[in-house]
């Protein structure tokens, strides 16, 4: 419990110690930089979250465990009592008024620790839990951010792996565009050739018609020119005779 209180007090006072100036001889200089060398790339064992067990708020449990095999269960207490009596008998430590003051202060401290220690420990634990929660939240946010970056990178890699499909689509689109252009030009050539052929056919038909008309006119002209006056009179007389004969036949037929 005392160790947690000391650690909380040290964590609270650390920012002020970092910003402190040179205070004087015998005082810790917080601005001094330690461990300036390159860090070692070896696995560092994690620090324990809680300190070791202690007895009477001061003596570590390991001390008793070390003496138990050699002195028994009561050995540490006998050793401590013997050391105190030895110091008093040899006047290494002399009892004075300050001794009673120290005992009174120690009793008050023990009473305060026993009564208010759990509340202070709970308060320190709550502060520690809040800090751990903030650190855990930051850790989870960082993990989520890194996971999102990994997912984005994977999606980008998947797109890169599938880019040949895009190239194939573009290649097919270009081939289709070239095919459409080729068909359009081929149709344009077909229409142009057809128009020219139609033009030549029209010209040939017109020339053939003109030749026929010219031939008919030429033949008719020469036939008319070849008829003499006597032949014309005979032809006219024969036509008149034929008409008279037809008229007589028409009159001779009874009317139905």
Curated annotation (Swiss-Prot):
A GO biological-process term: proton motive force-driven mitochondrial ATP synthesis
Transit peptide: 1-42
Location(s), subcellular: Mitochondrion; Mitochondrion inner membrane
Entry-linked SUPFAM superfamilies: ATP synthase B chain-like
Modification type N6-succinyllysine: residues: 131
Described function: Subunit b, of the mitochondrial membrane ATP synthase complex (F(1)F(0) ATP synthase or Complex V) that produces ATP from ADP in the presence of a proton gradient across the membrane which is generated by electron transport complexes of the respiratory chain. ATP synthase complex consist of a soluble F(1) head domain - the catalytic core - and a membrane F(1) domain - the membrane proton channel. These two domains are linked by a central stalk rotating inside the F(1) region and a stationary peripheral stalk.
Subunit and interaction comment: Component of the ATP synthase complex composed at least of ATP5F1A/subunit alpha, ATP5F1B/subunit beta, ATP5MC1/subunit c (homooctomer), MT-ATP6/subunit a, MT-ATP8/subunit 8, ATP5ME/subunit e, ATP5MF/subunit f, ATP5MG/subunit g, ATP5MK/subunit k, ATP5MJ/subunit j, ATP5F1C/subunit gamma, ATP5F1D/subunit delta, ATP5F1E/subunit epsilon, ATP5PF/subunit F6, ATP5PB/subunit b, ATP5PD/subunit d, ATP5PO/subunit OSCP.
Stated family: Belongs to the eukaryotic ATPase B chain family.
Name this polypeptide is given: ATP synthase peripheral stalk subunit b, mitochondrial
Organism in which the protein naturally occurs: Homo sapiens
Taxonomy of the source species: Eukaryota, Metazoa, Chordata, Craniata, Vertebrata
């Amino acid at each position: 419990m005392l160790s947690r209180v000391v650690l909380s007090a040290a964590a609270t006072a650390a920012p002020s110690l970092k910003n402190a100036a040179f205070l004087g001889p015998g005082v810790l200089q917080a601005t001094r930089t330690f461990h300036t060398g390159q860090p070692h790339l070896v696995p560092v064992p994690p620090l324990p979250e809680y300190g070791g067990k202690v007895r009477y708020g001061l003596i570590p449990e390991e001390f008793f465990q070390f003496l138990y095999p050699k002195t028994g269960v009561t050995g540490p207490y006998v050793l401590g009592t013997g050391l105190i009596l030895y110091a008093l008998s040899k006047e290494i430590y002399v009892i004075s008024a300050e001794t009673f003051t120290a005992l009174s202060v120690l009793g008050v401290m023990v009473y305060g620790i026993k009564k208010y220690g759990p509340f202070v420990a709970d308060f320190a634990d709550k502060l520690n839990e809040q800090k751990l929660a903030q650190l855990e939240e930051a850790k989870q946010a960082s993990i989520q951010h890194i996971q999102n970056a990994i997912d984005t990178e994977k999606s980008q890699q998947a797109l890169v792996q599938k880019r040949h499909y895009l190239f194939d689509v573009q290649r097919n689109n270009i081939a289709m565009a070239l095919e459409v252009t080729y068909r359009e030009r081929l149709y344009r050539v077909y229409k142009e050739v057809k128009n020219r052929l139609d033009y030549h056919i029209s010209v040939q038909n017109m020339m053939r018609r003109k030749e026929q008309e010219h031939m008919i006119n030429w033949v008719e002209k020469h036939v008319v020119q070849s008829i003499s006056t006597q032949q014309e009179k005979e032809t006219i007389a024969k036509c008149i005779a034929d008409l008279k004969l037809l008229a007589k036949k028409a009159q001779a037929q009874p009317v139905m």
